[in-house]
Amino acid sequence: GDDVKSACCDTCLCTKSNPPICRCVDIRETCHSACNSCVCTASIPPQCRFCYK
C-alpha cells in the first residue's frame, strides 16, 4: 500500500546538525522494512516524519 510514505522506525530521533539528520532507533537499529530513508521535518524541534523507498 501507500504505507511507505509514513512508515518509519519505532523511535526516530533527529540530530541537532544543520540540516538535521534522522536517526532511526529501532529494535534492529534500522528503518522500517518498507523504508530506505527517513527525513526530518523543518519544524522546531525537528521530527522524523517522511520515509522514502
Curated annotation (Swiss-Prot):
Gene3D superfamilies: Cysteine Protease (Bromelain) Inhibitor, subunit H
Assigned keywords, A-Z: Disulfide bond, Protease inhibitor, Serine protease inhibitor
Keyword Disulfide bond: yes
PROSITE patterns: BOWMAN_BIRK
Keyword Disulfide bond attributed: yes
GO molecular function: serine-type endopeptidase inhibitor activity
Pfam families: Bowman-Birk_leg
Residues under site feature: Reactive bond for trypsin: 16-17
GO biological process, one term: negative regulation of endopeptidase activity
Disulfide bridges in this chain: 9-24, 12-51, 14-22, 31-38, 40-48
This protein's GO CC annotations: extracellular region
Stated family: Belongs to the Bowman-Birk serine protease inhibitor family.
Functional summary from the UniProt entry: Inhibits trypsin (IC(50)=6.20 nM), neutrophil elastase (ELANE) and, to a lesser extent, alpha-chymotrypsin (IC(50)=3.44 uM).
Subunit structure comment from the entry: Dimer.
Descriptive protein name: Bowman-Birk type proteinase inhibitor 1
Organism whose genome encodes this protein: Lathyrus sativus
